[in-house]
UniProtKB/Swiss-Prot annotation:
Domain of life according to the entry: Bacteria
EC number: 2.7.2.11
GO cellular component: cytosol
Pfam families: AA_kinase, PUA
Chief place of localization: cytoplasm
Biological classification of the source: Bacteria, Pseudomonadati, Pseudomonadota, Betaproteobacteria, Burkholderiales
UniProt source species: Paraburkholderia phytofirmans (strain DSM 17436 / LMG 22146 / PsJN)
Entry-linked PROSITE patterns: GLUTAMATE_5_KINASE, PUA
Protein name: Glutamate 5-kinase
Function: Catalyzes the transfer of a phosphate group to glutamate to form L-glutamate 5-phosphate.
Length: 372
């Protein structure tokens, strides 16, 4: 089996906290130097590389003299602000040894949820790559809260892969890859060498929390691979402890787990809707509606809705759930949650008589709907 990285021209490489820090005691300058050297080698092969790097909070903790990761959001934000300075400085100096310019880009999910800012970020990144610069990206933890509590750079790496239409996402971690079960508890667990990025069984194999320094466990990596596949990007999850792992992957050596994007690449606008807009609520749909959405490519009509969850407004993104609770699709709703409750299970011809008006005959038009 040949590594998909060998034939990939544009890469997003995500490096976790444990691979750039001294077990939380500040940044590991030597390790960062090795990553810079490997990325420089990829550049020499004609590959474009965007680096998503953790480590800012760990570095900030070291500089502030903290030995434990704080729980308070404002303290995490302070650590991120202090640490981001050091992280950028070390990367800049290490890449300079290879005559490579770097650029620091701090993003939040809100940046990518706004269509204009999304396109601006895309334009900037593509320009930097054209100029031969290595963009170094991290979440802007100093101005957000949800990302610190629940976010992770695995997800950010996938979103960046979508943003720049990367060929592959490389997630480097302190684990060998995805196993069929937790190898610490099950001696029969084996490494999954290759699978479809959208395979449902992968989520069952994954799970568990990450380290005390990082935020992402294996499940976040599987979900990141699924997101990256929306833009046609393959994903490799591999151990950053492997010597020269990036160079070996680029040479064709199969290391870790390869998750292949089997589905057709989404149209750019639908990809943006699927991955960058926050879901504000849910509707439960009947089996007939599931079939029409997944097999017929139809719009979602009110008659197929059997339940409404959460509060949402017209124009927001909602998820469509099967009766079993599995997300089938998501899209931009034409009606609010209050309106949807009134028109659910009714044919479109009755919308006006119930509400006094009819905005659209569909709850979600197929042009604004994405299968997941």
């Amino acid at each position: 089996m040949r590594s998909v990285i060998a034939d990939s021209r544009r890469l997003v490489v995500k490096v976790g906290s444990s691979l750039v820090t001294n077990d939380g005691r500040g940044l590991d300058h030597a390790a960062i130097g090795r990553w810079a050297a490997q990325i420089a080698a990829l550049r020499a092969q004609g590959k474009e590389v965007v680096l998503v790097s953790s480590g800012a909070i760990a570095e900030g903790m070291q500089r502030l003299g903290w030995t434990k990761r704080p729980r308070e959001i404002d303290e995490l934000q302070a650590a991120a602000a202090v640490g981001q300075m050091g992280l950028a400085q070390v990367y800049e100096s290490r890449f300079a040894e290879h005559s490579i310019q770097t650029a620091q880009i701090l993003l939040t999910h809100a940046d990518l949820a706004d269509r204009e800012r999304y396109l601006n970020a895309r334009s900037t990144l593509l320009t930097l790559l054209r100029l031969g610069v290595v963009p170094i990206i991290n979440e802007n933890d100093t101005v957000v809260t949800d990302e610190i509590k629940f976010g992770d750079n695995d997800t950010l790496g996938a979103l960046v892969a979508n943003l720049i239409e990367g060929d592959a996402l490389v997630i480097l971690t302190d684990q060998q890859g995805l196993f069929t079960a937790d190898p610490r508890k099950d001696l029969t667990a084996t490494l999954v060498q290759q699978a479809d990025a959208g395979a449902l069984e992968l989520e069952a194999m994954a799970g568990g929390a990450g380290s005390s320094l990082g935020r992402g466990g294996m499940l976040t990596k599987i979900l990141a691979a699924k997101r990256a596949a929306h833009s046609g990007a393959n994903t490799v999850i591999a151990s950053g402890r492997e010597a020269d792992v990036l160079s070996r992957l680029a040479s064709g050596e199969a290391i870790g787990t390869q998750l292949i994007a089997r589905t057709a690449r989404m149209a750019a606008r639908k990809q943006w809707m699927a991955d960058h807009l926050q879901v504000r609520g849910h509707v439960v749909i009947d089996d007939g509606a599931v079939e029409k959405l997944t097999e017929g490519g139809k719009s979602l009509l009110p008659i197929g809705i059997v339940g409404v969850q959460g509060a949402f407004a017209r124009g927001e993104v909602i998820a469509c759930l099967s009766a079993a609770g599995r997300e089938v699709a998501r899209g931009l709703t034409n009606y609010s949650s209050a309106e949807t409750k009134l028109i659910q299970r009714r044919p479109s011809g009755e919308i006006e008589s119930v509400l006094g008006y009819m905005l659209e005959p569909e709850l979600i038009h197929r042009d604004n709907l994405v299968l997941v």
